[in-house]
Regions:
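A short SAM/SAH-binding and catalytic strip from SAM-dependent methyltransferases
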Residues: 164, 168-176
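Rossmann-like AdoMet
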Residues: 1-97, 103-146, 166
């Protein structure tokens, strides 16, 4: 499969859309830098075009659909994972593995010196994400990108061969 994950793109869109509100459950200023205006507008149009699916009475706008139907799962899971990550860091975690990382921006928003992040996803996702991060001038110095098939069964060896230290406390996220 050589296509980008539509689920990852939609999750990124949800986080970008959520940033426009005054009160945010999840603050993610980096997400906006990774999604193009064209992608944002195209996804918005697709959601509006399918509004009748969510609200058959035809009485819905983009914000209503997003806030009542689409955003709660993505925003809630992401917020829970980030709160858990912050707790793990307080408890001494020095490594952070993001399985099926997609366009997750948490490794770039953690403020913890000496924490190494490992983003693991399919090669085309890793390539696209690293290009988006580079274009947005996001510092990736604490992140190791690993292209891998998560169904391979050889993940432990792949991670270790990319600098993972099995003796350090590690937090693992699997939102993808």
């Amino acid at each position: 499969m050589n296509t980008l994950s539509q689920t990852a793109l939609m999750s990124l869109y949800v986080k970008v859309h959520h940033q426009k509100f005054k009160y945010k459950i999840l603050k993610d200023e980096i997400a906006k830098k990774l999604l193009t205006d064209g992608e944002y507008n195209s996804i918005s149009k697709s959601i509006i075009d399918g509004a009748d699916f969510f609200f058959p009475d035809g009485n819905a706008d983009l914000d209503l659909i997003m806030n009542k139907v689409i955003s709660p799962t993505v925003i809630g899971r992401s917020k829970f994972a980030e709160k858990s990550l912050k707790l793990a860091l307080k408890l001494g975690a020095k490594q952070y593995i993001v399985l099926a990382s997609g366009y997750d921006t948490s490794p770039y928003r953690i403020n913890a010196d000496g924490v190494k992040a490992f983003e693991i996803d399919r090669a085309e996702m890793i390539s696209d994400k690293s290009n988006r991060l580079k274009n947005a001038e996001i510092d990736c110095s604490n992140v190791t990108f690993i292209s891998a098939d998560l169904t391979d069964g050889n993940l432990q060896n792949i991670i270790i061969s990319n600098g993972f230290d099995k003796d350090k406390i590690t937090f693992i996220s699997a939102l993808g």
